Amino acid sequence: MIDGSGSWALRLRNGQAVFDEFMEAAPFPISRATLARRTGLSKPTVSALVSDLEDAGVVSLIPPETSPGRIGRPAAPYALVPDAALVVGVDMGATKVIVGVADLLGRVLAEDRIETASHARAAVDAVVGSTRRLLANLGKGRLLESGCVGVPGVYRPRPDRVEMSPNLPGFADLPIREELSERLGVPVTIENDVNLAAVAEAEAMDDRGGLDFVAISVGTGIGAGLVMDGKLYRGGHGAAGELGSIDMSGVADDRAGRLTLEDLASAPAIRKRFRHAVDNDFPSRLARDAEVSEILLAASSGDEAASEALGIAAEAMASAVAWLSWFSDPARVVFGGGVGSNPIFVDAVRSRLEHCLDETPELVASALGSRAAFMGAISTARASVRTTFVRGRLGR
């Protein structure tokens, strides 16, 4: 780190370094001496920057504890003020939208769930309306600094469009990042929802399994987020992980032509396969229009129609995981989404995968469940605050 205060750019850079240390230490306090040691800045420079951040309401002094008989003045630590800025995270799914406002520690202060409209434009309007309502209820509308929205498709920064989103149409003519940033008044990041789920899963892991793993979301659609060497892998065109589109025509004994993984293993596919089994006289104790959770539970107890539906879905998913394993050799596969986070589904995939690979990755159901993408959006919005917040506060 270069010390000094000879230029505005240098002051911002140094302020950024100090703010980053406060973010890393939060919620615990940190002393100016420790900040100087970690950043490589001089103590006078650190003291000046901490004073500026304190004046801006970003950090606050924590009164030091005194002990009887102590000689000398104890160090005066400072801590991040959690609600000095707020972020909004959004999971824009095919069946629901989750909108949440969080503080700088990532604590969700307010949250809203909205049934997804059938068009992307309506979903964007719902996100804006919900965000404004949550901020108004909190009484902190002016503190919003950043946002992140997870979308069920591939985001192309140029020309600011979402593609490959069959389950939520209408993105083709919608400059989503530009519109959301303008309407919310803060920078907004757009990211694939399963990539965000992978970000959240990586943060939740406390072992080396978080360095090389695949997060697979199985719900209305199917997608994957790949983490390699601890970094999210997007591919050359941002479309890495579009697992639901791969050809699985050889898995099912159908004459319907080309079948994708999504055609065989998604929630709608499992329901459709179950109805087909019932119509073809497979015994079942369930109603023909049973929910996927009911189908999976019935399959675990031997229901023939339910077992047929789950078996085909699990066989297709095991083939896809085998393909991913040959390609990227993940240490772990984390299943999320409404179907994927069900242990019955994971167990069924595991039993079939063992016949495909000599060494199988660890298969686990997500501990975050259906909130993984939302939590990843909060995390990403917090990360982007680091690049925008100091400039705005030190410039005031």
Region locations from a protein language model:
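ATP-binding/phosphotransfer module of carbohydrate and carboxylate kinases, centering on a glycine-rich
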Residues: 1-143, 184, 204-206, 250-396
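Phosphate-binding/catalytic loop of phosphoryl-transfer enzymes
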Residues: 90, 104, 143-150, 154-260, ...
